[in-house]
Amino acid sequence: MSTAMPGAFSPPRGLADLPLCPVYSRLGRPFHQPVAATSLPEPRMVHFNAALAGELGFGPEAGPQLLEILAGNRPWPGYASSASVYAGHQFGAWVPQLGDGRALLIAEVRTPARERVELQLKGAGPTPYSRGLDGRAVLRSSIREYLASEAMHALGVPTTRCLSLVASPQPVARETVESAAVVCRAAASFVRFGQFEYFAGRGQTEPMARLADHVIAEHFPHLQGHPERHAAWLGEVIERTARLIAQWQLLGFCHGVMNTDNFSVLGLTLDYGPFGFMDRFRWYHVCNHSDYEGRYAYRAQPEVGRWNCERLLQAVSPLLADAPGRAAEIGQDLLRRYASVYHRAVMRGWADKLGLREVRETDAGLIDEFLGLLQRGRGDFTRSFRLLGRIRTDSDAPARGVREAFADINAFDAWVADYRTRLRSEQNVDDEARAGRMNRVNPKYVLRNHLAQIAIDKAMLGDYSEVARLAELLRRPYDEQPDMEAYAAEPPDYMRNIEVSCSS
């Protein structure tokens, strides 16, 4: 039965008082078009993010009227929803027009912390950019996106957030018939590389400049008076992207669809589709079963990030200089930042994961040797790094309870000898303090694919308890949480290294 309230609609208490801040919406055409959401029959709240709701400035519970808004059955009070247009390179191939095919911007609000946040419904029905598709999302993929975005936030990775997950019995045809769902995503901005590519592909410099100036004014205000503001802004976008992908690598996270239309100009992890946290470490791990050539494999991600930044620079080159040759020179100078920023970020991150206070160039060999051990022995990425915190420098005894996790124990013991030597080379070695530091960067819990699948299977039967359990667990990924030990275990063999479909 629908939860729609009879008679006149009044906003949920507190929602009407939440100040709207319609900045992006005022850009109007050609950036986006007004689109109303398609009603979702019999909506049910699967999970509501009370913590994020508090940050946004309204209550910790979603009553029936708020549910209607988050299902797309009622508009946000005082705001007209819209869908944005963009283009992009998908698996390296240029696509001149894409766009929000099932996502609608439903509000821009000012939080109590004076931050502007955009709210977007994903799965809200068809838009002018749906390319003949139904504009819906399915429960399976929506659970994954909801849990992943909040898990990544708790891990300290820049990301879009999710406020709510709403399900419906409405059937949706994908590879099989599934049920519909809608997630409400939150971010400071959903502007993507592909929006600039769209206008570049049409030779429309004026709207591209307007969009760039909007992004700078709203999200990089310190650059507004800069004499070369567009170049300075692009430099910061490149650096944010490099640091973001370094964080992905350090967590064993594979995005799965690193198309330019899925890259945020704010350096946020955007669009959780066939993503995955690696179980057993493989340099060329591919999480998307549609990625036949491994374009977006784990090892390829840093270079893909650089390539995507190059496409952005190519698109906005008219904003850098009037002369194409000079614009290209500026772009190449900016692009060189990517490799150096990525290298510094990833080396600092690996050092932190090994408990090293200093970063030395010779540490690259130690890191590569450890990753080689994982690759050859099919070691679990997350669990192996967490176990390293147990190794002590005050003894040369075998690292019992750790070495057993490695297939080649002799090779591991040899590596540990080198590792202990490196740890002891730093002054004032304190094993307890080091273990504490390591446990703050090596998570115990990540959203493994098999855990998400268990929650999905239960939710499809109407049991949302596992979604709630995972949402709570993943809020504290670095804590021991002894009662949840089973969630840190490696997956059973039949659920290892699941590759996920793009179908969502």
Swiss-Prot record:
Disulfide links within the chain: none
A UniProt-annotated Pfam family: SelO
Active-site residues, Swiss-Prot/TrEMBL: 261
InterPro entries, per database record: SelO
Annotated GO MF terms: AMPylase activity; ATP binding; magnesium ion binding
Binding site for Mg(2+): 262, 271
Catalytic activity: L-seryl-[protein] + ATP = 3-O-(5'-adenylyl)-L-seryl-[protein] + diphosphate; L-threonyl-[protein] + ATP = 3-O-(5'-adenylyl)-L-threonyl-[protein] + diphosphate; L-tyrosyl-[protein] + ATP = O-(5'-adenylyl)-L-tyrosyl-[protein] + diphosphate; L-histidyl-[protein] + UTP = N(tele)-(5'-uridylyl)-L-histidyl-[protein] + diphosphate
Keywords on record: ATP-binding, Magnesium, Manganese, Metal-binding, Nucleotide-binding, Nucleotidyltransferase, Transferase
Coiled coil segments of this chain: none
EC number(s) given by UniProt: 2.7.7.-, 2.7.7.108
Protein name (database record): Protein nucleotidyltransferase YdiU
Organism: Methylococcus capsulatus (strain ATCC 33009 / NCIMB 11132 / Bath)
Lineage, top ranks: Bacteria, Pseudomonadati, Pseudomonadota, Gammaproteobacteria, Methylococcales
